[in-house]
């Protein structure tokens, strides 16, 4: 997001970029090919059937209108009560069909949204896409696309799609009536006579076509403006969420003035785009209002044209009213195309944002560094050069081999690439060159700031596994061992533990996770930075005591941790890092034999 006078632009607003996106059918078709989708398709057929039944009721009402006014014109007042009763019964049946169709449509909408949300969420979480998207800033506001755009896309697709399916039936049905009732139109030009059959039908189509073309010309920018509005609203919401998440830090810095400025700058984009959208919508609404005013006078035209037939006795009063009703039904049905134009522009914007999400989540992730599995539990690197996304070199890591059961301390000045090395070992950093060998399973990564999910404290301790995977007694014992005895009775208390626990307490929870998972290889990235030196020693001692055969790779700054490692990897600045054996602490570690958890875990 930028803060200058120009709007930030993303690929969903760029026509050239949109050509590389998957076709919209990738969003529309997959659900209907599933077993759940087949049942929803049956429900959708019932909805379409109810729509066509409503059209039949409208046709019946059209015929009823003719009979009603014919009875009045012929002074046959005795038949009026019977006609009114029949009208009431048909109206009640039509209302029941219409309401049933609406309920079924809502059910289909809920089912489709649930499936599409699950499908897109799986794509977001697959292959670490969620991390790659944020790391490389490939997409903004993914949460808004899945939560909000999916809801709007499903709703608008059903509304527009069902409208497109019902309009032809209504138009054809009433066009037949209008063609029959209208008769031929004779014109005399230069002594020649011309006859035009179904002239009222052609007039209705020409009238609606002109309105649609004019509406598109006036509102064509709405697609881009709507997509931009979704993004700008999402950017503004992200800033407010950040204030909530880091409320304490902002309060310590007294940064409310700065945050207010950032929020105002972001919201200025929102307001500017709203005004631009308002201007376009006003033009469209003004035109539509004029059309609506003219439409109220349109029935006079077929009445005047058919007046000679009425005066000559070739057309009854009921026939005249029936023709006017049919003309209104045809123009009203065709009006769907220009009345639904704003909805169509919103649908296009929603579809483009979801297509962009598919484009980003489905392309093969970049992986310049070769990753291989270690059969012996060793961790090794050869020819490893770490780069940033632009290709600039961050650090050159010397070749090293860490045998199973050994413990290595990675040291160096801040910013020299230590944490990036651990990301590369985890397979989360693709930029660079060289080869990495690591165990395929039984590994556990502890970043400096661990993720604490909302829910119970036990769920936070057992993450990423389910809370039911471990007994309460084991979790309580680990809380006591890791210096969290005060929280042991609160194991099943639901809370936002990420805000309730201090930074040091969160790092203690992370150590409890490691001891609970019993991995064979542990990677620690300054995961005790919020603890005092004594607490740090106690947790490292507990780790070695409980996992004596585990391979450990630690990134840390404190020299006191040398006593808990037998190998170091130094990153001097600005020279290249060099690996060496610490002769004073040289010990031969045992091969890894601890119980391995499933897969590589980042917590």
Describe each model-derived feature in a short phrase:
Residues 138, 252, 288-291, 355-409, ...:
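Primarily ABC-family ATPase nucleotide-binding module
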